[in-house]
Amino acid sequence: DFMLLAMDQLVNHLDKLPLFGWTPKVIIRCRVGQKTPLDAGPQHTQNYARAFMTMLHTVRVDEVCTASEVTAYERALLWPDSTIIVENPIG
């Protein structure tokens, strides 16, 4: 949930920089907290991946729910623009 604190920089800076002719290559990895075996509480188990996908137009957002989706990291590395990878172990 600390990604919400970075929303100004993500939406108003990182997402807009390509419109001004500069395309930084940034890869951000964040994780959604699990509810089992220990509940991290409502503040750390919320998933904002869909909100990021809606608000960010030049930044790719990938949601990874299983270990088999490790290709998301390769895509982020090969993708020319910035990427946010949201690890959501509870799907």
Task: Enumerate the predicted regions with their spans.
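Conserved thiamine diphosphate
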Residues: 1-91
